[in-house]
């Protein structure tokens, strides 16, 4: 009886493996990296590196439609430089009180200027257009934003800062566009650890 159960369990896993192998072939969305995904009204929205301000939409995280342009960078610090829509990296997005908020990082090291910032834009529609309420520099020397909403409703942003390597910081937010208090360092590379074997990460 025990042998019979083991055979049945093995067959079940084998069937599942075959099913997934047939239905999902990676990559499911070629050419997209360092992406953020938001679920809204039963659909998934993704944006990130190489999407150039576009979102892709899916019902199942496997089959994705054609790109939809949702944001064009328009601010004083990037205008006139090489930091265009192709520099929209590492998206994060969420909906709060009917407003959609989109964050991304710019990591541009061009001959004309260096621009390493986190940018925020918002829209009333999940597919934009997203507009930057602050056209000035929003946050210097930080990348890869992630906003977390706690159970009490408090918002926090987590991000990477270039400080002797990539250090992880957190900061409380007044609202999706403003901070409250000072940033707090949460993680940094320790000497002689794996994070420092090549370059500090």
Show the residue positions of the predicted features.
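Bacterial Sec-dependent N-terminal signal peptides
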Residues: 1-22
